[in-house]
UniProtKB/Swiss-Prot annotation:
Catalyzed chemical reaction(s): 4-CDP-2-C-methyl-D-erythritol + ATP = 4-CDP-2-C-methyl-D-erythritol 2-phosphate + ADP + H(+)
Active site: 10, 136
Classification via Pfam families: GHMP_kinases_C (PF08544), GHMP_kinases_N (PF00288)
The protein's name: Putative 4-diphosphocytidyl-2-C-methyl-D-erythritol kinase
Protein family (similarity comment): Belongs to the GHMP kinase family. IspE subfamily.
GO MF annotations in UniProt: 4-(cytidine 5'-diphospho)-2-C-methyl-D-erythritol kinase activity; ATP binding
Function: Catalyzes the phosphorylation of the position 2 hydroxy group of 4-diphosphocytidyl-2C-methyl-D-erythritol.
Length: 283
């Protein structure tokens, strides 16, 4: 039997660093959405007690450094599963891009193994496993428009956003999330008013929403990679309603209220970077 799961990418409409916790991790406040740029995870059972991963992408590890492997390993150990599993990853989401590719693949693996082995895990049990892997995995288990708090383990659904078009631009380099978080100075970092952004979403005020969007990590990443600032400026000059880095970068996204605007932004970026995508929000 094969189990198929779609693994959509995520964007951070807002990312605020509230402070550093005693354990060295950071307290976060984020608003995230899912987009129709997807990886696909296919899982089948093996008689031999092992975890085998293969992929159509050469840009990711296929061993225990992969978040998908970690998800399967945790579940096998936690539930005493002595059977093996083969996991096939079909990648469309760029790697090390701030789009949650590894996290959404891990979340899809958790959902798939829950079905394959009839584990009957509820949402909270899956979140507990996901949080052991990474701070974005709990969100990726459910996706949609959500407020994410704590270290990523608290996920509160928000209303679906009005339809809009999104253009993604991924520069030709990746970013290590850990390296960006190591450079955070909580006293001087720029802050984002997540409460205002949340209010704009709750009131369906698109103009206030785009004005309220922000990312506390953006300045840190731009200092090391100024091309991100150039991409943002180019998008805005082409008519984007807002241009913002997602996650720890380097991907920049723009939101556009009409497809005509999105096409202008897309065409202006197509020759500037190799990886440019026009996508929609998942509803």
């Amino acid at each position: 039997m094969k189990i198929f799961e779609k693994a959509p990418a995520k964007l951070n409409l807002g990312l605020d660093i509230k402070g550093r916790c005693d354990d060295g991790y950071h307290e976060l406040a984020m608003i995230m959405v899912s987009i129709d740029l997807n990886d696909y995870v296919t899982i089948s059972e093996l008689k031999e007690d092992c975890i085998v991963i293969d992929s159509d992408s050469s840009k990711m590890p296929l061993n225990n450094d992969n978040d998908v492997f970690k998800a399967a390993d945790i579940i096998k150990n936690q539930y005493g599963i002595n059977k093996g599993v083969h996991i096939r990853l079909e990648k469309s989401i760029p790697v090390c891009a701030g789009l949650g590719g590894g996290s959404t693949d891990a979340a899809a693996t958790i959902r798939a193994l829950n079905r394959l082995w009839n584990l009957q895990m509820d949402y909270d049990e899956m979140v507990a496993i996901g949080f052991k892997i990474g701070s974005d995995v709990p969100y990726c288990l459910g996706g949609g428009c959500s407020l994410v708090l704590g270290k990523g383990e608290i996920v509160k659904p928000l209303p679906t956003l009005r339809p809009c078009w999104i253009v993604l631009v991924k520069p030709d380099f990746g970013i290590s999330t850990k390296s960006i978080f190591r450079d955070i100075d909580c006293k001087s970092i720029s802050r984002v008013d997540i409460d205002l952004l949340k209010s704009a979403i709750l009131s369906s005020d698109y103009q206030l929403m785009v004005k309220s969007m922000g990312n506390s990590l953006e300045d840190i990443t731009i200092t090391k990679n100024p091309v991100i600032s150039t991409i943002k400026e180019r998008m805005l000059n082409s008519g984007a309603d807002v241009a913002l880095m997602t996650g720890s970068g380097p991907t920049v996204f723009s939101m556009c209220s009409t497809e005509k605007k999105a096409d202008r932004v897309f065409n202006s970026m197509k020759g500037f970077c190799k990886e440019v995508y026009k996508v929609r929000l998942l509803r």
